[in-house]
Amino acid sequence: KKVIYLKLDTRNILNHKNKILKKFIPKYVFHFAEFSRIVPSFKYIKDCWSFNTLGTFNVLLYVIKKKSKLIYSGSSSGLGKEINEHLSPYSWSKSKNIELIKNFSNWFNLNYTIVLFFNVYGQKQIKNHYMAAVMGIFEDQYSKNKPLTVIRPGNQKRDFTHVDDIINGTILAAIKGGKKEYQLGSGKNYKVIDVAKMFGTKI
């Protein structure tokens, strides 16, 4: 089927003059357009706040207006102890957005499903950029025959999930999911040092 790509800004989605956007009534709105890294969120806190807080607020208003179902990508960084949500501007913004979504559901009958991602990797992943995740960094270094960078001792455990599995899980959650959170992960944790060793190169 035909796909039409529109270059938009979530912070201005309600006031955008694009005719297609105004007329189109989406069944689902997949909202993944946010600042999405923990460490860079300290340096780029203004961007994190602008996209994650203001942008998401406007997306919620748009979804309510269109009477669509929102599929929101939460963050696994806020799981575990309650204090985790306060560890970074990114974690805090994602946690508060989930609270806001649930409040919108109570206040305005917003239909939603939240999916939580765990260290997504795969084709077209960001490799050489401050937004790159560990798997993308490893791939970039490996392709350039450079040693892989691991902060000692490298025992941090992560659940790594391929992007194809994330896509399939997200679509399934959109169609069948209720007003709750779904963790999309492999269920297996690997040490960062062990993942680096899988590349079979210098570390």
Q: What does each model-found stretch correspond to?
A:
Residues 96-104, 134, 138, 195, ...:
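Hydrophobic alpha-helix immediately C-terminal to the catalytic Tyr-X-X-X-Lys motif of short-chain
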Residues 50-53, 94, 128, 132, ...:
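Short, solvent-exposed loop/helix junctions and linker helices
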Residues 81, 123-124, 192-193:
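A short beta-to-alpha transition loop/helix N-cap that caps and shapes the active-site region
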Residues 87-90, 118-132, 152-163:
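Glycine-rich "substrate-gating" loop/helix at the edge of Rossmann-like oxidoreductase active sites
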